[in-house]
Amino acid sequence: MSAGRSAGVGADDRGAALVTSLVLVAVLVVAALLGGVVADLLAARQRAAAAADLGALAGAPAAQTSEANACAAATWVVRENGATLRTCAVVDGDVRLTASARPRAPWSRWLSELLGGAVEPTAAAHAGLR
């Protein structure tokens, strides 16, 4: 038997560290991408919530005159805050609305469409002058 390597356990382990390293790097890259997607979805949820809150507040004074005026004011404010108004109604003098916001990162949109449809976090808000 030579002095270099023994013929026992682990004799065929040459290159195992490279394969293990490549798998580890791949797992870390996927984890980082998923973390970015989650962060982007959370940011979109916050954007939708802020837009809904501000839209309801903007529509509340106009709700005293008509539902159309209230929803027009809410639509403008929601759009200016980077979201889309989904529903708007005046109920008992309160403006009630929902808004949604799309993720901004392209990989988030791509992944959400790959998983069965565009994911748009939605938020609801209401405001009135009472």
Name each model feature, range by range.
Residues S2-G4, S108-R130:
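Low-complexity, S/T/G/P-rich flexible repeat/linker segments used as non-globular hinges
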Residues M1-A70:
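Alpha-helical assembly-interface signal, strongest on the long, hydrophobic N-terminal helix that forms
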Residues A52-D53, V78, A125:
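Residue-level preference for non-acidic, small/hydrophobic
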Residues A31-G35, L97-E113:
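Short, structured secondary-structure boundary patches
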Residues R45, V91-D94, A123-A125:
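Low-complexity, flexible helical/coil segments
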Residues S2, A56-A105:
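Short amphipathic secondary-structure patches
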